């Protein structure tokens, strides 16, 4: 969440930076200021009354020693006590309302973030490789069906639409990709692998910013206190909630494989056909916790770690920077990496790399002790390193052969155990 002091001291600047975002969150700034002022006024009056009560109580003791009547003064003490209790209620109510408002205000976009209303204003900043020349490319649905690799029908029968069953070489390829992703990010790029639960508490979802805004998109228990994770970002970052780290502990770099669960699955049609948008998918997530002065520089490094996966697999991709209107709720700056899928004839997002500044850390109370011994909020980064099954889709469609087989990229062969998937092998 945003620092209340920043809002208090620079309300018009905060509004100006929030206005280019989608939605009307900037309108909440005045409500925040009103709640903050009411809470602070209640606390100020309470402190004054407590001082008066202390002084009056001493006066009562002195008067009683002299045998003088103290009934009127004692009445005032009772009156003060009643007022203090009322002020406690007012302060508590306004503090709760203030927290609720702050939880619904997104992060401030980085000052150099491109300004735009939606994804059509996202600039392309990098292009790697070339689109493969494939005559009449088949899409992954047809390719995988012919090879018996995946079944949407089985997924629908077991669970419902938007779920996939992998079989034979299809399941083997998914496992190979996961191991390839993890090994690349841990062995080569220096992340510590962590294994985390796939179910988290509500407070963890609030900590990384998925709640309260995106609650309808999440799978939760009936009382909405426990949730299936939409991304490993949630449990991994929350490993350090309510923690004060030492400066020497930073940076912390973690990578985790998890399945991810999301209710939203998009509309029907070719753009969402097959595995493009599903309710459950696998992903390797990268998370960094670091000092504020390092965060935007390291975002570029993290992005290169995600890009390295596509380069090793020889997949054509582009990088776009999200404009203010397309920026994620908790993010100050985001790059999307989109891989080319020949059978779809479009780019598919496989990684989103973001810097959250101290936004998540404030929600999680994640701090570190600096060289002067003062507690400072950490900055957090995360990015997909990368997501499946869109990577799976691009791989099938890019390496399809005229005979219907799928060539396995050289970097993946040691993990898959073969250099090709043929109908008789699937």
From Swiss-Prot:
Gene3D superfamilies tied to this protein: Bira Bifunctional Protein, Domain 2, Serine-tRNA synthetase, tRNA binding domain
Q: Which reaction does it catalyse?
A: tRNA(Ser) + L-serine + ATP = L-seryl-tRNA(Ser) + AMP + diphosphate + H(+); tRNA(Sec) + L-serine + ATP = L-seryl-tRNA(Sec) + AMP + diphosphate + H(+)
Tell me where in or outside the cell this protein is found.
Cytoplasm
For bias type Polar residues, the affected ranges are: 47-59
Describe the subunit structure.
Answer: Homodimer. The tRNA molecule binds across the dimer.
Q: What pathway or pathways are given for this protein in its record?
A: Aminoacyl-tRNA biosynthesis; selenocysteinyl-tRNA(Sec) biosynthesis; L-seryl-tRNA(Sec) from L-serine and tRNA(Sec): step 1/1
GO molecular function term, any single one: serine-tRNA ligase activity
* A GO cellular component annotation in the UniProt record: cytoplasm
Under the heading Pfam families, the entry gives: Seryl_tRNA_N, tRNA-synt_2b
Q: Where does L-serine bind?
A: 231-233, 285, 384
Q: Name one GO biological process term.
A: selenocysteine biosynthetic process
Record's family? Belongs to the class-II aminoacyl-tRNA synthetase family. Type-1 seryl-tRNA synthetase subfamily.
Q: For the region Disordered, give the residue spans.
A: 44-67
Enzyme class (EC, first level): ligase
Instruction: Tell me what this protein is called.
Output: Serine--tRNA ligase
Annotated function: Catalyzes the attachment of serine to tRNA(Ser). Is also able to aminoacylate tRNA(Sec) with serine, to form the misacylated tRNA L-seryl-tRNA(Sec), which will be further converted into selenocysteinyl-tRNA(Sec).
Q: What is its main location?
A: cytoplasm
At which positions is ATP bound?
Answer: 262-264, 278, 349-352
